[in-house]
Amino acid sequence: MGSDYITITITLASPSLNQKPPRARWANTDWETLDRIIKGFKVPDAPSCPTPPKLDEWMSEWLNPLVALLKEHTLVCRPSHHCKPWWTPHLTILCREYYKAARSARKNDTPHMRELGGTSKAGYFKAIKAAKNKHWCSFLLAATPQSLWRAKRFAYGRAQPRFPSLPGAETPQQMNTVLLNHFFYPKEPCSPPPRLRPHKSAPSLTTEEIDAALAQCSLTSAPGPDGIPYSTWKQVNKINASILLRILAPLVLLRYHPASLKGSNGVVLDKPGKPSYESPSSFRIIVLIRTFANILAWIIAVRLLAAARLSRLLHPNRCGSLPGLSTYNACLTLTNDVKTLQRPRLKVSPLFLDIKAGFDNVDNNTLARILSEGGIPNYLVSWGSSFLGERSCTLIFQGAPGTPAPVIVGAPQGSPISPLLFLLYVSPLHFRIPWGLMISYVDDFALTVASLSYGGTIRRLQKLFKKLERKASRLGISFSVAKTELIHWRTPSQRHSAKWVAHIHIKGEVFHPSNSVRWLGYWFTPALDPAAHFSRRIYLPRVHAPSFVASVLPEQASPPIYATDWRHH
């Protein structure tokens, strides 16, 4: 062999079918058999003053068998591309005749046999098209407001998820590390207490609190790593309410969140409309937590919200993730106060800000200090510290290694208590503004000031932004400069004024006043004309509805809807 030849190693392997793993069909759980078993399921008392590992062991000893019991009596389905919901017995007969005629035409290549094979083929595929249209039409006739979006997904198809392409990360393991370091900043972990002791002033957990928490849980929420939905826990609690009560009650009294409930899956999704996807900031992570952990989080969230309102830790202009305060309330408050400031013929200007990666920057020690200084009961502060500490997350994307990684900082966005913890974390940012106001909705802030001129409002906004930035730096958070927007409100008498074009300098960048700003889903114009918002909302259905209706008509090519292969676990 000459030097021009290089030995090539070839490995032969069976093709990968990329079959999806079986998943439980919780709508077909055998509750008749489980009813008797769950009624006799007994949970012993938790240790009185255990160490954290001892309580984790007790938690896993009784929760894991319960989860295994539920999965054992639940059917599993394996998605298959060979099972079609529109398939009929008549198509089976036509399929056999078609393949029989095709084989005969290949064996006896005569004009008569070729014509017979072509006729059989045309009839077979025509029957397939008719069966698809019939099934699609019946699916649309039975559509509900919720399943209509499912029909749209079938009609348009689902976009393939982007594979992260990050500089300096060539392997899935390197990409996993880069994404973890971007979203969950490395930090020294907090050490848990050596021994857990019951809090004397903590109210005992009641079945009413558990029922109220389960009522808040949505049946359409995606489950966490264990795959159990809220509907299953609701049925378990309905059969035997003592199970959830005896497992969750010690966790409240001992102010502890077990390690077995801190594991989560982080689904990496690309943000639509980004010019480039070579940066981790072009992606977002949706954290999926075990539903059992979220039940406890709902209970603590209700107690924490009541304590925060009692201690006046939440500012009156703080909206978002609070009952009864929606985006409509925030926008209505902003509009009403702007008109009030304009009555003395003052110029009014707002600056819209957005906190960068707000949930990912929540520091455990800082939050505990804010809650303690705000008068929150000690058992809620301790439970919050335990909830945020020593978590783990397994990133899910194409080619992900699937290894859990420790998460030291940040609040998981998939938990019902995380929005409230974030609101309390940024509560020190709110301060009183003379002749102005500050309104916030989760991580969106609006600074509005009034002055005799627009130049005066710009100077006031710059001073207030520096003050707000100093407060934010103490919390370890910052504002996204790219999402900053400025607008100057105008009254009808100021419509033809040429002095409202004053711009503002923020961190070395110049922001000119916009003719329209979209904040919290509402469109604002300098004249506060509501027609600017409603005209856009009315225009969108007129543009997108015809294409959507055309795509779901039965006469069109029906999208493939795959059924499942049912098997008992």
Segments the model singles out, each with a brief description of its role:
Residues 200-412:
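Conserved pre-catalytic core of RNA-dependent polymerases
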Residues 43-79, 183, 232, 236-265:
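Amphipathic alpha-helical blocks
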Residues 1-81, 173-177, 530-548:
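Surface polyanion/phosphate-binding segment centered on an Asp-His-Pro turn
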Residues 200, 463-466, 477-515:
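Short, conserved micro-motifs composed of acidic
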Residues 12-17, 26, 59-62, 73-77, ...:
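Basic/polar low-complexity segments
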Residues 357-374, 445-470, 528:
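Catalytic palm subdomain of template-directed nucleic-acid polymerases
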Residues 300-319, 343, 348, 419-452:
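Active-site palm subdomain of RNA-directed nucleic acid polymerases
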Residues 77-79, 84-89, 126-127, 135-142, ...:
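Non-catalytic, peripheral interaction segments enriched in hydrophobic/basic residues
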